């Protein structure tokens, strides 16, 4: 192989002293008191890799001794499918870059503490979904988006079309589940937009969760809850203009398991929604958001 120089690995039998020294050096450097001595992170890493080069069989033993991971963040590109994140990954998006972090070692996760997540098992989500008719005002931001979507339609049949849209969106419990988990976590000023997902079917809607501000950090526990709540749905992190968002759309090649979710009477929800006095500023903000996202192409 041209251009490569292969270095022969040293024999363990010929140089056991190096192994012993590396082992002792590695363990000494992981003592709490070592942080104030002249050792540096580079010294620690060098001792570690010298040791495993001589005794790879002991690598697992040393990995178990690790307190802090060697790699704390991983750079990603958008759009990013959250199914590629592992259970302990948090998400950070800002003008400085897009990263997955290790939740237990993320300064933002540690400083903010665990999100105030209540019960988010499937039974609790189904109960909230069924009882939404009794909490219309609590979910007004979710429902206001449907009102604006209906208002964008033209013609005398607009009210009938809005009721039809509401019926179709309400019939997709996973969209409500995703919003409920975010609302339950305490994240404020989140908006949701609904668009037809032609690839998933003529009556299937997808949802964009649009976050406020110029930076976004999602705790790893929140991400885990959302993924668990939206099985058979893709959760994709993206950015459009200056807005960070999550796209919730069905995996159209997979069947959803919603047979355990009771149907919600959309007509009753619509009647209560018509009697609800929703803030005009909220409706205006939604109108601007829909106009801004009309040209957005959702990732496949």
UniProtKB/Swiss-Prot annotation:
Fetch the InterPro entries from UniProt.
Herpes_UL31 (IPR021152)
Question: Where does the protein principally reside?
Answer: host cell
Q: Which GO molecular function terms does the record list? A: zinc ion binding
Calcium: present as a keyword of the record? no
Q: Where in the cell is it found?
A: Host nucleus inner membrane
- Oligomeric and partner information: Forms a heterohexameric complex with NEC2. Interacts with capsid vertex specific component 2/CVC2; this interaction directs the capsid to the host inner nuclear membrane to initiate budding.
Q: What is the stated purpose of this protein?
A: Plays an essential role in virion nuclear egress, the first step of virion release from infected cell. Within the host nucleus, NEC1 interacts with the newly formed capsid through the vertexes and directs it to the inner nuclear membrane by associating with NEC2. Induces the budding of the capsid at the inner nuclear membrane as well as its envelopment into the perinuclear space.
Q: What is this protein called?
A: Nuclear egress protein 1
Lineage, top ranks: Viruses, Duplodnaviria, Heunggongvirae, Peploviricota, Herviviricetes
